[in-house]
Structure formats: structure tokens, C-alpha cells
């Protein structure tokens, strides 16, 4: 976890993601990324110069109208002394039964994020932290290029004026392999995704493509990240 926290600190310093007095909602999907982020931010409160509060929030899509079991995540939050709220929803039913979406991931992400925004404001948070990591950023760059025909990526930090809420991604310098290792080493209670298309998404296909490309172009992911920062695409140019 030490390396993860060091890389989070680098992102926090580079993009001024956290300031003293912040109240941060951490979006918890139950996956390894969000759980590692939660634990890291909780531990970093002990030594970061800025003082901040944390709340954990989850949107349960209730796929097949079945509530996901988050009891082990609740226990983790109790140990960390972090308030935790689960919002049960009908996202699974809306996306797969009512709308029958051909591209369900995009709609699900938008709807889930909208609920997370509302939950963040309910808990008087001024920031929402999501667990997107280094590899997510590189994959998003390629997905925007291949599927959207544009150069772009999500931002390390963005401001949602309609909600008066900052969206931050403190793990953008953390490689997925290191995140996975941390989750395993600390026996974090990862919740298996029940999404019907899990493992068969555009992001999964893009991830496999990047692996193939790196056989011919070593260090491709690092070069993409460097390009995002040097060109200051979508706020990736380091602030200091």
C-alpha cells in the first residue's frame, strides 16, 4: 500500500486534488480499485498536511433485481471509522430490461454517477473521489480515439457546476497491477460484479489491444500518459 499512497500523494500534489477542510465522498463499487482508494485515503489522513473527512457511498444496480451483498465492505468501513451508505437502485432493470441498451456501459456509468453526485451532496461533501487508475486513463484515451473519433480522456479533477461538486481521481498515477497486488495483500473484501456484460465490454477489448500493441511498442502506456500531460489534454498538464 505504501507505493499506492506515494503515487496518490504525487497526483494530489500535481493537481491539487485535496485541500484542508475537504469532505470527500469515495464512490465504492465493491471492486478492487475503489476499495484500495478508500483504504489509502483513510490511512493518508494520518500524515498528509491537509485535514479532510471521508464518507463512503455505493450505488447498487441490483442486477436481476437482486441486492448485492456489501456486508464485508460495511465491516471494512466500520474498522476504518468511515460512514458508509448503500443506495439500492433499479439501474440493472432500466438498462437491460426496459431500455435493452446495445451499449449499456455508457448509460450505466452516467446514471450511476448521477446518483453518486446526489449522494455526495446529501452528505455535505464538496468532492467525489473515484477509483480510476493509470491504465483506465490510457484505455479511455484509446476508446475515445477508436470509438468516438476524438482526442481526449477523463480529467484528474473536474468541476460540476450544476452540483457545485468536484470530481477527483487520486489514483491516476497507480498502475492496475499494483492496485490489484495491494487489494490481495491486504485481503480487501472485493465484491464480484454481477453485471451481465462484465468481461465483454469495449474497455475489455481495448485493454487486450493495448497489451498486444505493447509487444511491438514497449512502454506505450507511459508514452500515452506523457503525451496527455505534455499537451495538457483535459487538464492532464501538471499544475506544479
Protein language model regions, located:
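Short, basic, helix/turn surface patches
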Residues: 109-121, 157-163, 210, 214-229
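A short, charged, Gly/Pro-tolerant segment at domain boundaries
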Residues: 201, 219-240
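Generic structural signal for well-ordered, non-membrane alpha-helical segments
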Residues: 1, 109, 199-202, 206, ...
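Residue-level detector of flexible, active-site-proximal loop/helix-junction positions
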Residues: 61-63, 91-93, 158-161, 174, ...
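Catalytic subdomain that performs nucleotidyl-dependent activation
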Residues: 127, 135-215
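Short, solvent-exposed polar/charged micro-motifs at secondary-structure junctions
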Residues: 95-98, 202-204, 233-234
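ATP-dependent adenylation/nucleotidyltransferase module used to activate substrates
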Residues: 1-139, 147, 177-185
Amino acid at each position: 500500500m505504501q507505493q499506492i499512497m506515494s503515487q496518490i500523494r504525487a497526483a494530489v500534489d500535481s493537481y491539487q486534488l485535496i485541500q484542508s477542510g475537504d469532505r470527500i465522498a469515495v464512490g465504492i463499487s465493491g471492486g478492487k480499485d475503489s476499495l484500495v482508494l478508500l483504504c489509502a485515503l483513510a490511512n493518508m489522513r494520518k500524515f498528509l498536511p491537509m485535514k479532510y473527512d471521508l464518507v463512503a457511498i455505493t450505488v447498487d444496480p441490483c442486477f436481476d433485481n437482486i441486492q448485492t451483498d456489501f456486508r464485508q465492505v460495511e465491516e471494512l468501513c466500520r474498522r476504518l471509522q468511515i460512514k458508509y451508505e448503500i443506495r439500492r437502485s433499479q439501474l440493472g432493470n432500466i438498462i437491460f430490461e426496459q431500455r435493452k441498451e446495445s451499449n449499456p456501459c455508457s448509460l450505466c456509468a452516467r446514471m450511476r454517477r448521477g446518483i453518486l453526485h446526489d449522494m455526495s451532496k446529501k452528505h455535505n461533501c464538496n468532492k467525489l473521489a473515484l477509483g480510476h487508475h493509470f491504465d483506465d486513463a490510457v484505455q479511455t484515451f484509446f476508446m475515445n480515439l477508436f470509438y468516438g473519433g476524438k482526442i481526449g480522456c477523463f480529467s484528474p479533477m473536474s468541476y460540476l457546476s450544476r452540483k457545485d461538486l468536484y470530481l477527483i481521481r487520486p489514483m491516476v498515477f497507480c498502475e492496475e497491477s499494483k492496485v490489484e497486488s495491494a487489494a490481495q495483500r491486504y485481503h480487501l473484501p472485493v465484491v464480484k460484479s454481477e453485471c451481465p456484460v462484465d468481461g465483454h465490454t469495449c474497455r475489455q477489448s481495448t485493454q487486450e489491444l493495448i497489451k498486444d500493441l505493447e509487444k511491438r511498442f514497449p512502454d506505450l502506456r507511459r508514452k500515452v500518459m506523457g503525451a496527455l500531460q505534455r499537451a495538457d489534454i483535459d487538464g492532464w498538464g501538471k499544475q506544479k
